């Protein structure tokens, strides 16, 4: 499957590498051209600008943003202005869930799906996979399932396949409508940080 990745920091770059290893076509862009060049050498297709990235994607397009939360809404709006009905924007950063709800509502009249994905796995995700907490329209999430399945850890040897459990045993879950993915990630982070603080006081 083809996907565009914007933001090639440690997590974004490693997510591209994981997708390339599993046969996906990745079109990549970053303000730092060196980050783009490094992934082109590993098999990705480089883009010189956001517009170039969009031009190199086939409809229906999917653009995944791995950016700091402070700039994500601005960049998402810039992409939405250039995308078409049926395309999707995925926010895999640590954005506030209410912003995801607002952006989804803003883009919906344009026919553009906005999917928020809480992404957990850090720099180890390249080998171990990423736990994904997904919010957004059912049809759009289903269309992107091959991407989510490739990024996720997989069931592992000790978890029996059970269709009734859906994708959860494989490390990714459609949590609900817009905002649900980032809301669940916020809860996840709160628990994680609470445990770390508690252990520090032991």
Where in this protein do the model-derived segments appear?
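NAD(P)+-binding Rossmann beta1-loop-alpha1 motif at the extreme N-terminus of oxidoreductases
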Residues: 1-62, 86, 123-126
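Rossmann-fold dinucleotide-binding core
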Residues: 3, 76-77, 96-201
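Small/polar loops that bind or transfer phosphate-bearing groups
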Residues: 7, 28, 64-67, 91-92, ...
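Structural detector of well-ordered beta-strand residues that form the stable sheet scaffold
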Residues: 27, 47, 89-90, 115, ...
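Short loop/turn and capping residues at structural boundaries
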Residues: 30, 50-51, 93-94, 118, ...
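A short linear boundary/processing microfeature
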Residues: 42-45, 69, 81-82, 150, ...
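Rossmann-fold NAD(P) dinucleotide-binding segment
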Residues: 50-114
């Amino acid at each position: 499957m083809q996907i565009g990745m914007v933001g090639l920091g440690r997590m974004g770059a490693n997510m591209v590498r994981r997708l390339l290893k599993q046969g996906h076509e990745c079109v990549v862009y970053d303000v730092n051209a060196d980050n783009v060049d490094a992934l082109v050498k590993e098999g990705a297709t480089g883009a010189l600008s956001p517009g170039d990235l969009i031009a190199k994607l086939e409809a229906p397009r999917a653009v995944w943003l791995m950016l700091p939360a402070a700039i994500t809404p601005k960049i998402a709006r810039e992409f939405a202005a250039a995308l078409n009905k049926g395309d999707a924007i995925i926010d895999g950063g640590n954005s506030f869930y209410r912003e995801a709800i607002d952006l989804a509502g803003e883009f919906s009249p344009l026919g553009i799906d906005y999917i928020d994905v809480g992404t957990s796995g850090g720099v180890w995700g390249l080998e171990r996979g990423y736990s994904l907490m997904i919010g957004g329209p059912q049809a759009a999430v289903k269309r992107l399932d091959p991407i989510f399945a490739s990024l996720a850890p997989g069931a592992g040897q000790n978890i029996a396949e059970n269709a009734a459990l859906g994708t959860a045993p494989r490390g990714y879950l459609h949590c609900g409508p817009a905002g649900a993915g980032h809301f669940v990630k916020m809860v996840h982070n709160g628990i994680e940080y609470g445990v770390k603080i508690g252990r520090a006081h032991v």
